[in-house]
């Protein structure tokens, strides 16, 4: 395996009596996208902040490009690109000016930045908006501008904290296309997300965290095979909940109830589907197990207080 571009070892962060990150370790190889998924309050954003040197860990180490955070913070940040959850674009500057001003923070000369701006705007599909201010942009345009800004210094590693939250499906797909282009160029990405389709589409590996602890790690399809039965049958409609205590329960390896829906997890859905034909008033959906099933199995279906 290639040498890690980012290595996190035994990170711990406490706030008072609460441990929000507990003995967390992971690494990212060059050209790899590592996704971090978990419920609200699982410690994802705190982990990103420690990787950026914005939050000091109580225990553990962060090493990037062979350098140590926070001792070598400036040298590390010169090779990082960051897209945070919140919009941090300057509302008083145009798109092009946002890129120019941001590049100056890295000590880049104006001429060097101006040379990069046209390609960055083209990458973000914002060439026609070069002179527009952020307030004139859609949500998707703002996120793409934030991504373009994160690329001003030509970073080796991108840290993206829920980069597509709040975007409509079309804007999310366009953002995914841009991120896939960056991966094809050999850049590395550390990504937090609540979208399981995003995680499956972009990430080579996933880190599942809950209550600040790593509870699973691996390639998306490998994790699904490891933790889940291959077939899922969702049943809903009048009388569906009664099936949870019916003889059909024996036809599934595992059964879950959420709201008005019963989820049957099985290695072979055919006998179950045949039995369900006796309940024409019910609606059924037969599908393969996916990352959302994995997420819910490992972290639970209960909504967290800060969700």
Segments and roles (model prediction):
Residues 176-267:
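ABC transporter nucleotide-binding domain
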Residues 100, 104, 111-129:
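Conserved ABC ATPase "signature" region
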Residues 60-71, 76:
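Conserved ABC transporter NBD signature motif
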Residues 158-161:
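Catalytic Walker B motif of ABC-type/P-loop ATPase nucleotide-binding domains
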Residues 154:
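Conserved catalytic motifs of ABC-family nucleotide-binding domains
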Residues 133-137:
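Conserved ABC ATPase signature
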């Amino acid at each position: 395996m290639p040498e890690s571009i980012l290595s996190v070892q035994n990170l711990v962060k406490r706030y008072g009596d609460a441990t929000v990150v507990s003995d967390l370790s992971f690494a990212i190889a060059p050209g790899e996208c590592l996704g971090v998924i978990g419920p609200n309050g699982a410690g994802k954003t705190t982990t990103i902040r420690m990787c950026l040197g914005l939050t000091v860990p109580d225990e553990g180490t962060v090493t990037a490009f062979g350098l140590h955070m926070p001792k070598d913070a400036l040298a590390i940040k010169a090779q990082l690109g960051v897209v945070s959850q919140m919009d941090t674009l300057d509302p008083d500057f145009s798109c092009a000016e946002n890129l120019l001003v941001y590049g100056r923070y890295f000590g880049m000369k104006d001429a060097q930045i101006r040379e990069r701006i046209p390609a960055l705007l083209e990458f973000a599909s914002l060439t026609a908006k070069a002179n527009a201010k952020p307030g004139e942009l859609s949500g998707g345009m703002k996120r793409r501008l934030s991504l373009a800004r994160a690329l001003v210094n030509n970073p080796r590693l991108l840290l993206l904290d829920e980069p597509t939250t709040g975007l409509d499906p079309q804007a999310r797909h366009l953002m995914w296309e841009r991120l896939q282009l960056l991966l094809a160029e050999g850049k590395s990405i550390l990504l937090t997300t609540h979208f399981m389709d995003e995680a499956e589409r972009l990430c080579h590996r996933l880190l599942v965290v809950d209550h600040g602890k790593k509870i699973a790690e691996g390639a998306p399809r490998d994790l699904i095979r490891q933790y889940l039965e291959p077939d899922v049958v969702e049943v809903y409609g009048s009388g569906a909940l009664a099936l949870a205590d019916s003889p059909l329960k024996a036809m599934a390896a595992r059964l879950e109830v959420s709201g008005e829906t019963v989820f049957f997890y099985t290695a072979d859905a055919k006998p179950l589907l045949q039995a369900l034909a006796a309940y024409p008033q019910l609606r059924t959906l037969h599908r393969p197990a996916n990352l959302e099933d994995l997420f819910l199995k490992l972290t639970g279906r209960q909504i967290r207080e800060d969700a």
